[in-house]
């Protein structure tokens, strides 16, 4: 059992990884999603960090394993092994940093070098709270995402703006559609388990009712016997 009272072995497990240049707010995005919080002085990730979060998609429990990667060049060699296992890839750029957006093709190529395009790709423009410093327009980001068939959204890890839309609508729906057969299978198993428990409960109830009928019959017989004895006196 985990802290939510859910058996871990019953959860559908999916791996999500965030990639992008250093300083784009990758760690802050995960912290906002997992803990609904923002830390102004967040320490840069060294190498790779991970955490997990249990979510519910179409009434099914899912455990997301979240990998946070370092943006520094010296740690890039660590990333491919985790990219291979990821079902969801978040590509993060900073709307106030043109270089971070222009680095996206390089990041995508690094991903495709070790993994096919079957993963769910999500392009995220972070730091929309810095609107006055914007270098990449919404239209530029959206166009790039559409050209690559990616999900797209702009967010602010600082304020939490658009996080509900990004995760609970766009990403969750993409996950459900991508792994629908797995969701359907688990839903069927849950349905059969519920019916098995229902049948067992009914069977126990019927047994208890049978015993009650027999017990009531004995009480009636004893009462009748007692009445006869009373009349004899």
Language model region names:
Residues 34-61:
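Switch I (effector-binding) loop of TRAFAC-class P-loop GTPase G-domains
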Residues 51, 76-81:
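Conserved alpha-helical scaffold flanking the Walker A/P-loop in AAA+ ATPase domains
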Residues 86-105, 115-118, 129-135:
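Conserved Switch II/interswitch segment of TRAFAC-class P-loop GTPases
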Residues 56-58, 80-85, 112-117:
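Conserved catalytic network of the ASCE P-loop NTPase/AAA+ motor domain
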Residues 62-77:
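Switch II (G3) loop of P-loop NTPases
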């Amino acid at each position: 059992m985990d802290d939510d009272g859910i058996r871990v072995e019953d959860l559908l497990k999916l791996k999500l990884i965030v990639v992008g240049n250093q300083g784009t707010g990758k760690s802050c995005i995960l912290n906002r999603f997992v803990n609904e919080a923002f830390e102004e002085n967040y320490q840069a990730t060294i190498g790779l960090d991970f955490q997990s979060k249990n979510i519910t998609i179409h009434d099914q429990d899912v455990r997301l394993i979240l990998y946070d990667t370092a943006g520094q060049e010296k740690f890039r060699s660590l990333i491919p092994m985790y990219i291979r296992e990821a079902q969801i890839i978040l590509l993060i750029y900073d709307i106030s940093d043109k270089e971070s957006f222009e680095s996206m093709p390089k990041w995508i190529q690094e991903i495709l070098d070790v993994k096919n395009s079957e993963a769910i790709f999500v392009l995220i423009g972070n730091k929309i709270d810095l609107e006055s410093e914007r270098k990449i327009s919404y239209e530029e980001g959206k166009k790039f995402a559409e050209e690559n068939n990616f999900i797209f959204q702009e967010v602010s890890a600082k304020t939490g703006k658009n996080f509900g839309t990004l995760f609970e609508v766009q990403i969750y729906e993409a996950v459900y559609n991508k792994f629908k057969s797995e969701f359907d299978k688990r839903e069927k198993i849950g349905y059969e388990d519920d019916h098995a428990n229902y049948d067992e409960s009914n069977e126990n109830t019927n047994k208890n009712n049978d015993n009650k009928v027999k017990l009531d019959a004995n009480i009636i017989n004893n009462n009748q016997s007692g009445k006869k004895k009373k009349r004899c006196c």
